[in-house]
Amino acid sequence: MLDTEKIKEKLQSSLSIERYIHTLGVAEEAEKLAKRYGDEELVKKAVYAGLLHDCAKDYPAEMKRRFCKEYHIPVDDIMKKQIDLVHPFLGAEVAKREYGVEDEDILEAIRWHTTGK
């Protein structure tokens, strides 16, 4: 898994400035909450999940469709009409494949960050 500085560099080049600032804020808040309620391992996981939760959000629609097909991510009729809804599921795959995340807790946090589980 990439270290947080390398992740930030990569995200800065792939996200809009607004999304990047949002991402840094989410990681910061996730870190604060994890410090309050968990141990150092939870803090680390929370920061990674916070940084990567929207890693696929700014992908163009056609790219999202292509990657969903390539990564075998199910896309229902509602998602087909509103392709941005795939971003948490696609984001988990991108985190795994492009950022080297193997920890299932982090991947699940990314996958379910819009709806919870």
Language model region names:
Residues 1-2, 105:
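Long hydrophobic alpha-helices with heptad-repeat/coiled-coil character
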Residues 2-16:
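Generic N-terminal amphipathic, Lys/Arg-enriched alpha-helix
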Residues 4-8, 27, 31, 92:
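An amphipathic alpha-helix signature
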Residues 9-13, 42-117:
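Divalent metal-dependent catalytic cores for phosphoryl transfer on phosphate-bearing substrates
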Residues 16, 32-35, 115:
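Generic secondary-structure signature for well-ordered alpha-helical cores
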Residues 19:
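Short glycine/threonine-rich catalytic loop with a Thr-x-Gly-x-Asp
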Residues 22-28, 32-45:
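A positional/architectural concept
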